Amino acid sequence: MSEGTVKENNNEEFNAYHTLTTEEAAEFIGTSLTEGLTQDESLRRLKAVGENTLGDDTKIDYKAMVLHQVCNAMIMVLVISMAISFAVRDWITGGVISFVIAVNVLIGLVQEYKATKTMNSLKNLSSPNAHVIRNGKSETINSKDVVPGDICLVKVGDTIPADLRLIETKNFDTDESLLTGESLPVSKDANLVFGKEEETSVGDRLNLAFSSSAVVKGRAKGIVIKTALNSEIGKIAKSLQGDSGLISRDPSKSWLQNTWISTKKVTGAFLGTNVGTPLHRKLSKLAVLLFWIAVLFAIIVMASQKFDVDKRVAIYAICVALSMIPSSLVVVLTITMSVGAAVMVSRNVIVRKLDSLEALGAVNDICSDKTGTLTQGKMLARQIWIPRFGTITISNSDDPFNPNEGNVSLIPRFSPYEYSHNEDGDVGILQNFKDRLYEKDLPEDIDMDLFQKWLETATLANIATVFKDDATDCWKAHGDPTEIAIQVFATKMDLPHNALTGEKSTNQSNENDQSSLSQHNEKPGSAQFEHIAEFPFDSTVKRMSSVYYNNHNETYNIYGKGAFESIISCCSSWYGKDGVKITPLTDCDVETIRKNVYSLSNEGLRVLGFASKSFTKDQVNDDQLKNITSNRATAESDLVFLGLIGIYDPPRNETAGAVKKFHQAGINVHMLTGDFVGTAKAIAQEVGILPTNLYHYSQEIVDSMVMTGSQFDGLSEEEVDDLPVLPLVIARCSPQTKVRMIEALHRRKKFCAMTGDGVNDSPSLKMANVGIAMGINGSDVSKEASDIVLSDDNFASILNAVEEGRRMTDNIQKFVLQLLAENVAQALYLIIGLVFRDENGKSVFPLSPVEVLWIIVVTSCFPAMGLGLEKAAPDLMDRPPHDSEVGIFTWEVIIDTFAYGIIMTGSCMASFTGSLYGINSGRLGHDCDGTYNSSCRDVYRSRSAAFATMTWCALILAWEVVDMRRSFFRMHPDTDSPVKEFFRSIWGNQFLFWSIIFGFVSAFPVVYIPVINDKVFLHKPIGAEWGLAIAFTIAFWIGAELYKCGKRRYFKTQRAHNPENDLESNNKRDPFEAYSTSTTIHTEVNIGIKQ
């Protein structure tokens, strides 16, 4: 047995890694702290220990799938009908029903299997990744491929992929509430080692990090010690396996109450009324309703025979019951939803929860972040202001990673506010600033040390890396886009991060590194810095800082950057008028700085402030230094303000068009961003969230459109609810602000979607009706909390998702209408058919049970699938969102169901009676509901005519419901020829076309094939009766067209009398009309914005 195998076996038994040092842990598990595992070894271990999963994400439960197909009300009607058929010895009907049940269950199983596989593959697309070191190089792999011995890197926003023995931590906190129930984050320390004699609980093992915990602060490196079900969370998952949650064991309730609750849960799960997506539950409830209606109709049949129930009456009752069951409905729904989820992948939307497919069509408010969603997320440094030094501008730069691109200029001494308000226009711009700086060709009254201090801070208060990829000869970067923009500028000025710290980049050649260092020795910032501590960016404080030791002058330096308000609150001084001495910051000084922040933000730039402080080794003792490096408040106090940077994040090219289309679709778009209010307002105007002519609106209206997070959070719930409209832009917003916004929308009965990418966005993503996470820049935690993931982080992809959600909802509505209208037609037809009595006084059913089943299962199923694949209607995104409370069962759908059903009933009844009394002699014979005899000739031929008519009407109905109101012959009014328009209508959906053709043709063989026709279907070949079938099918088509014409006239009249409900008129209105017409902005709510 190999050494690795021994260690793996020991690893399964050993649980005291918290008692080992990092070196001991690495030796025990067989890995290198610096190199990690080799690729071959990692593959061998993966094969030995299996994938790192809890075993329940992608496993297909075949038993549950079978039960799901069998245990529903629709199948139960078929099963009962089958049992009765066999009980009365109608072997043919019973056999056909058995076959239908088997086919239905088989098709359902296949489609559910495919749908499950599709959803599992989509889950894999959005599953968390892990960052590991293998062969000495950092790699990103799927979390399921992590094995014991991997060296794993984690940072803020990551979900820890496996149990880790930490070997390096930097201000590292994790959320272990999922494991321990402790709501507060837990601080970790890799240097701790616990005694072997001590009993240390899982929650107290502070040198370990546990699988599925979220990183809420800092970063760390650790050895993977346990994976999958061997991890701490895996042990819990293993103990919970097999608990369905259907049995109530509430100790506060009595045995009888628990039994009642459990019975309801089990029955609901059995019938599908309390499991699955909301739409599945609604349809399961519909199935239960139809079951009881079927029972009622069967009772009516028996009552009409005075409950003298013989074989024929029982079969007729079965026939009527079957007519009420759209048995193919669940199958078609499953196919439609799985296809919809697959289609969304091609449109950069990954569906994680099927519920979201239904919810997307009802969304009427979208709350979106700005950075990387509305904008490209590829940030470019545009302006830098260093007090007493001047303003640096960067132009002609479009590549966010290439430091060699662009022109750098200096406006000496002028601040952005000053040069933008300079009436002379001559601000003395100095071109080629970099060359002038290093050639010392700058005005004598400009102190280069000011720029050096700012540049050192910008470089070191930064963890992004910029490098030239030797393989592709292209510039690339790793890190946050904002930090990348700053690091690119530092690299442009020949002062990259590794030039100050001496760190070697694994992505650059040594030649490049040496070049940077050798060039840097004679330029600003030549000191060598050692990283001591880091306080990472936090959405609460909105800043980050790093502590470095300068080996050249033996000083400790704290460098910070962040939002202006956050940084300025930490500063007590800045460089005075001479630019040399540090002087206290006064309120007047802060207001001067604030003016420049406004000036930059009003140009759509994201503004960050920079500050620093330093002290010598003699100024602090060890305890004071430890306090500084561990206490954020101490480290980030009494800083010296150094300057500002304005970063431009250009809007995506598709954003403005997407916002316009959302407005056309009746969807409001809100921007909730952490950026400064001026930046947010400028970008919002650029993309159309705010009107471009905002200056035409009164200040009161502007204040209702734009707020800051503190202003919105400062309002009570009552004050928020009293606002006539909710703000379109909230700047400087926190995660809690997003939660309050969603709560406010929900109180207004709005159906909203929320985008998010950070750990702290999880509450708002969960609370929103549709949570949307970012696939590229989103954290693992936000993805897990979301319903859908945008694989390209693009706002326009949300439009794709909404459009696909509406298309799918539309199509579900169409095939539900088609199937239920057929059921109504068949049920009414058979109930009316009770009036036909044979020579023995028994009812003669005008359609046989097998004919009913054929129309429901064979004729209707494939056209219904075709309707599920129907393309989006041309006006799909010109309609308002559908009512989420009503769902697909609107009053229009309900009325249409009965209208089409009644028209179809009339056509079929006319065909039956026309054949029976017109073409034939009108004799109803005797015993014609079971076997054929000579007296049944007229009845059997008339059934054939009615069967053909019902079949063809059902197929024509599928074409008619492609559009709920528009005439089938005017589906494409933009076509230049009626003939072309007709063929475009029938050929546009080829699956539907061939399904209908198949249905039309299938009527002939079942009428003419011997034995099948008279023994199974209980009808006979016909001749002249085909004319009746064709005539009354056309009559149905005309009736359907007249009904739709009446609908169009009705809605036109409604629009004329209620122009405010006219959708076309609404689309032409100003989307900001609700704001401009608001007349009551409460004066007690101070929402003014100072600028």
Swiss-Prot record:
It is found in: Cell membrane. It is a multi-pass membrane protein. The active site is at D369 (4-aspartylphosphate intermediate). Residues 499-525 are annotated as: Disordered. NCBIfam families: ATPase-IID_K-Na, ATPase_P-type. One of its GO terms (cellular component) is plasma membrane. It catalyses: Na(+)(in) + ATP + H2O = Na(+)(out) + ADP + phosphate + H(+); K(+)(in) + ATP + H2O = K(+)(out) + ADP + phosphate + H(+). Present with 639 molecules/cell in log phase SD medium. ATP binds at T371, E483, K561, R606, T673, G674, D675, R732, K738, N760. Its cofactor is Mg(2+). One of its GO terms (molecular function) is ATP hydrolysis activity. The keyword Magnesium applies. Residues 1-63, 112-282, 334-815, 870-885, 965-991, 1043-1091 are cytoplasmic. InterPro entries: ATPase_P-typ_cation-transptr_C, ATPase_P-typ_cation-transptr_N, ATPase_P-typ_cyto_dom_N, ATPase_P-typ_P_site, ATPase_P-typ_TM_dom_sf, ATPase_P-typ_transduc_dom_A_sf, HAD-like_sf, HAD_sf. Belongs to the cation transport ATPase (P-type) (TC 3.A.3) family. Type IID subfamily. This is Sodium/potassium exporting P-type ATPase 2. The active site is phosphorylated in presence of sodium or potassium and in conditions of higher pH. Not phosphorylated in presence of calcium ions. GO terms for biological process: intracellular calcium ion homeostasis; monoatomic ion transmembrane transport; potassium ion transport; sodium ion transport; transmembrane transport. SUPFAM superfamilies: Calcium ATPase, transduction domain A, Calcium ATPase, transmembrane domain M, HAD-like, Metal cation-transporting ATPase, ATP-binding domain N. It holds the Pfam family Cation_ATPase. Catalyzes the hydrolysis of ATP coupled with the export of sodium and potassium from the cell. May export potassium less efficiently. May transport other cations such as lithium. Sodium/potassium efflux ATPases are involved in salt tolerance and maintaining the membrane potential across the plasma membrane in high salinity (Na+) or alkaline (K+) environments. Its EC number is 7.2.2.3. Residues 503-519 have a biased composition (Polar residues). It comes from Saccharomyces cerevisiae (strain ATCC 204508 / S288c) (Baker's yeast).
